[in-house]
Amino acid sequence: MNFRYTIQLLLTILTLLCFSCKKETPGNAGILQLASCTIGSDQLKYPDNTSGIINDGNIIIIFSSAVDTNSAKKNIHIILTDNSVVSARFSFSEDLTTVTMDPDSPFGNNTNYKLSITTSLKGIKGENFAGIEFTFTTANAAFVIKNITINNQNFAPPVKGKNIALNDLNISIEFSASLDTTNIKSHFLLAGNPVFNTEITSDGSIIKLNYTGLLAGYTNYNFAISSNLKARDGFTFSGFANSFFTKLDSTLKFPLISDDELLTLVQRQTFKYFYDFAHPASGMARERNSSGDIVTTGGSGFGVMAMVVGMERGFITRTHGISHLNKMITFLETCDRFHGAWPHWLNGNTGKVVPFGTKDNGGDLVETAYMIQGLIAMRQYLNPGLSSEQDLIDRINVLCNTVEWDWYTRGGQNVLYWHWSPTYAWDMNFRIEGYNETLITYILAASSPTHTIPASAYHQGFARNGGIVNGKSFYGYALPVGYDYGGPLFFAHYSFLGLDPRNLTDTYASYWIQNVNHSLINWKHCVKNPFKYVNYNASCWGLTASDLSTGYGVSEPTNDRGVIAPTAAVSSLPYTPEQSMNAIRYFYYIVGDRVWGQYGFYDAYDVGRNWWATSTLAIDQGPQICMIENYRTGLLWNLFMSAPEVQSGLTKLGFTY
């Protein structure tokens, strides 16, 4: 403890004792006592130093009785270590017991001060004061960003920059103190390590960063300021990080061609997935471009229809197509089947089931339906006048007629079940109910000449006794059946690669209106863009099941993740020709440098997460080539609908077509 403060404290105590013990008499002034002294929320301590005092607070001094205001102004001082006095304005409470000192300028940062109240201070009645001196130290200033903008947009987190120009990046940062300019450029960090041009204002508190190099379009860039940055007076900085999205690079990535040529190109490139990339031993379609020997039943059914398109358009010769089909049929005849149904996945070499899940190691009736849809369309395309093709027709008929659709009613219930396993039997317990992508399953089951199901299974099982009816409008488009907003767009594709919806109606819906409006709702949702995803627009749309940055999942208006899957808009071409054609142009010409690959459009992308898939999936590639063909010529629709058993099945279920 400071010796001088010790002596002063003892004298103050002795004085207080003397006055408190002495009986007052007329003409004997009393004692003025100090009740408290605060700066901001901090109580000044005595005799200890009080640290961490805010630099813009008032000093509030409370006495036991009223003070003489003139005496207070002369005898209460804020003093620096060099004994200079800090000027301040005084104000007093109505009863004159409280003195408020408001310094003319804020206290310095990390600075020592004294608050001196001398013995000459008097109360309003002449009371004496023993005198006291407090010491305090102000807090070190926070060196912080006061304001930051990027291309004139607020850039303070959580706000992120959007649609930032590709060739003129400007970041302006105002700090709370002047900058130490030593190696100043090294403290401002951007992916790719570009060198900023810098401009600092005369007071050193504002820095302007400019980069005129070319940034990549539709890219999430991380910008950071190092915590090694310092203020001129030595104060440290805690660091800064934020990100921004660049605007779309709208330059054409490929030369312009006619729309007809573009559609042919998309079909030709996508066809390669089912022919060039087909499993060499089985001819089947691999689940995805990284699946090795795993082949998929449903995706291969789409591939059979793609083979029709490939032969018809001359992507391969008919001889090569027939040879490939023979390989596939041979595999389908000898691979694992479960009461006639194929499993979801198979090993393309051995033909053995590859479990899709723990208990999903048996028949998958929906995947089987997609295969049968493709085989029937192919059968109708083959020429019975050629012995080699008649042989394939006969073998296709055997495959179709040995699917035990009725077995999958699980003992004659009025519903179909999705799975059956020789190990787990019906443990999956998944009823095939609508409205979704499984409509074709009921139509083919009703069409079977050998293992048919009753119409009641369709109406009670799939249609749920009318439970599939919706009837509401979304974004101005009426939806006859299904979930609100329609669900993912693959509902409008998988069953309708062969099944022609143009004139298809039953007691529940017009399926042309259903699919058109479902597609328009999906498109309009992306145009409205309620979640403000950076890449959505009238030409960039399409929510369906696809790969995601985190795995695989379903996107739809009610579960919008910001992920665009080209297959959604491309495969809706028959339903929304204008909107889908705009999307095809956009995917190819504008973002084709990122979404166009060896087998057509990659599966999906998410600009907001800076994620662009390089994967292709059979169930997403197949609908594109097939639905483009249905838009152009109606080929697959016409073939499938020409099958007599299909017509019988539709009539049985109460459809008109």
Per-region residue spans from a language model:
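Bacterial N-terminal signal peptides that target proteins for export
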Residues: 1-10
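Basic side chains
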Residues: 4, 22-23, 313
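Hydrophobic alpha-helical segments, principally membrane-spanning helices and signal/leader peptides
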Residues: 7-8, 49, 103, 255, ...
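C-terminal motif of bacterial Sec signal peptides marking the signal peptidase cleavage site
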Residues: 17-20
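Short, flexible, glycine/charge-rich loop motifs used to bind or transfer phosphoryl groups or to couple energy/partner
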Residues: 23, 49-50, 161, 293, ...
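Acidic, low-complexity Ser/Thr/Gly/Pro-rich repeat segments typical of extracellular/periplasmic
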Residues: 24-251
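Ser/Thr/Asn(+Pro)-rich, low-complexity disordered segments
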Residues: 250-657
